[in-house]
């Protein structure tokens, strides 16, 4: 099974952001990142 691990980036305020390795979109929360991966890249995980 394929896994898309988020690239963690620290911004200038010290907040951790999540970047999608497949398309480069940036998210503030892990929940938003997970939702994006399931909706936009979910076809990679389904048969």
UniProtKB/Swiss-Prot annotation:
Residues annotated to bind Zn(2+): 20, 23, 36, 41
Domain of life of the source: Archaea
Species name: Thermococcus kodakarensis (strain ATCC BAA-918 / JCM 12380 / KOD1) (Pyrococcus kodakaraensis (strain KOD1))
Self-association state and partner proteins as the record states: Crystallized in association with 70S ribosomes.
Annotated protein name in UniProt: Zinc-finger protein TK0143
Pfam families: zf-C2H2 (PF00096)
Keyword Hydrolase among UniProt keywords: no
Cofactors (names): Zn(2+)
Cross-referenced SUPFAM superfamilies: beta-beta-alpha zinc fingers (SSF57667)
Keywords assigned: Metal-binding, Zinc, Zinc-finger
One Gene Ontology molecular-function label: zinc ion binding
Coiled-coil annotated spans: none
Cofactor binding description: Binds 1 zinc ion per subunit.
Zn finger residue spans: C2H2-type: 18-41
């Amino acid at each position: 099974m394929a896994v898309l691990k988020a690239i963690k980036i620290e911004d200038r305020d010290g907040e951790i952001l999540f970047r999608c390795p497949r398309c480069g979109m940036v998210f503030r929360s892990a929940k938003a990142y997970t939702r994006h991966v399931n909706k936009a890249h979910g076809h990679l995980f389904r048969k």
